[in-house]
Amino acid sequence: MPLKWKTSSPAIWKFPVPVLKTSRSTPLSPAYISLVEEEDQHLKLCLGSEMGLSSHLQSCKAGSTRIFTSNSHSSVVLQGFDQLRLDGLLCDVTLMPGDTDDAYPVHRVMMASASDYFKAMFTGGMKEQELMCIKLHGVSRVGLRKIIDFIYTAKLSLNMDTLQDTLEAASFLQILPVLDFCKVFLISGVTLDNCVEVGRIANTYHLTEVDKYVNSFVLKNFAALLSTGEFLKLPFERLAFVLSSNSLKRCTELDLFKATCRWLRLEEPRMDVAAKLMKNIRFPLMTPQELINYVQTVDFMRTDNTCVNLLLEASNYQMMPFMQPVMQSDRTAIRSDTTRLVTLGGVLRQQLVVSKELRMYDEKTHEWKSLAPMDAPRYQHGIAVIGNFLYVVGGQSNYDTKGKTAVDTVFRFDPRYNKWIQVASLNEKRTFFHLSALKGFLYAVGGRNAAGELPTVECYNPRTNEWTYVAKMNEPHYGHAGTVYGGVMYISGGITHDTFQKELMCFDPDTDKWTQKAPMTTVRGLHCMCTVGDRLYVIGGNHFRGTSDYDDVLSCEYYSPILDQWTPIASMLRGQSDVGVAVFENKIYVVGGYSWNNRCMVEIVQKYDPEKNEWHKVFDLPESLGGIRACTLTVYPPEEATPSPSRESPLSGP
């Protein structure tokens, strides 16, 4: 009698052939052949026509053993068990929810295979192992039905009305896939209207991923929550988290203070946590007028000792603007989690005019965006960062390769307000020098001016807003590079009396002394230097070719302070001298500069990966700039900044 399969969709079904027994006297079912034709051309060849069947079977048997897999088998078995359940066949236990007397006959083996809870119940020697009817206290009727339906069908329907019952049941019975589905459902459905409730559910059932998402959602949309009043329903812990976060967007500190006061006054017991919440408001970033008109007029801000001290802190901070970089704390920091590569100044390739542009690079949009420009154009200047304040020191406002137009002025940029102020000037005008920030001080090393090359070193103290001289170098240097590591400053290479150097010097501010270290393997000047981990990298620059011309130095190396030893690394892709350099996410970015081999300013930005020892060209400046400088700053997100036009930067001529 021929074999028959009842099927309406052959493409779904795949049957393992080895179970088929046939002979020349037993014709194959046309239905089976049809299935094979649609599923496996190789089997079709093996089965062949009845006339050539034996030879084909022999050739198949002669080959290696084959394993066949049915993609539909598991779903067929699952459907079979579900039908048995619906028909009440072979069920060996009845489950009852804790809130009703409803009864649900099921198969122990199915429940145990899907749940560690039921596996332990039915195989661990518990009394329920022998019971025919089990009451599940803590599981509702709705939740139990959802769990049973999922185990037998692999499908789960959810809405906000059934979600909590389903979560309780899945958590109680340890049905992990259902928990995952509930997480996805919650995250995908978060809105301004329900985010507080979703957060409560996440906290109740320890849904960490959902809780993190709600935090992120509230941070991103807190300004909108303020306008709707939904923030008043937030629990203390989540509100405190929001107020302390650097990721909070589009809210002023005054907005946050007023909102917190509203939240506190909604219920009397909330006033007990007033001081804890106010510690997260950044009062030093408010204006004096805001503090006087809106903050000091609130009763508990005048009576609670903690709140009074917060106001005193803000007042003292604002009274000492020059000291602010060394007074930084969580309450004085910019409320942003965005750190960007920043460039400033430089001399333009064609017109030889000097830029005063301050830009940051947005890696998401691959665009340069403008921040407040400097008060005066600069190139060959020194830059350094203390407490996320950017200092721009000395340099030149006019294009002059001899340094005769060096300046002594110093400016400081505050990214919190996108503003510049002028601070104390250098004792000597300097250009082609190095500037480092070390232990809360600035050190301006060497350089040149109209009087010639400089061996002197000046130190700026933000606490007194003064520059003072410290120990000078043994010889004058300009075009050198420097970096800091381990509480000391290192200076490499440069030019002394028109001779390129390869020496490495170390300055210890505690002893006010210079010491010599192992020299570089290559002489170079107008190069750059930076620190990554415990390595001091020296990159690019140029040196003499013969007696009157210059060559790019493509070779690079790093210095180990522990070993007092230099090691070569991969060479640059293209020569760059007189550049900006910054370390961002443990990668070294070399920005702009001048190529002596090509005799032109360059716009290229090259990135070096210390782990892979590889160089890559990553992006370009909006224009070719030599004598440019670079660093990293924490700034407000790029979407809140102004896009920088490619060829229309604010430049100032000589």
From Swiss-Prot:
GO MF term set: ubiquitin-protein transferase activity
Domain BACK: 195-296
Record domain BTB: where: 91-160
Kelch repeat locations: 340-388, 389-440, 441-487, 489-534, 536-586, 587-635
PANTHER family: KELCH-LIKE PROTEIN 13, LD33804P
Oligomer and partners: Component of the BCR(KLHL9-KLHL13) E3 ubiquitin ligase complex, at least composed of CUL3, KLHL9, KLHL13 and RBX1. Interacts with AURKB.
Protein name: Kelch-like protein 13
Organism: Mus musculus (Mouse)
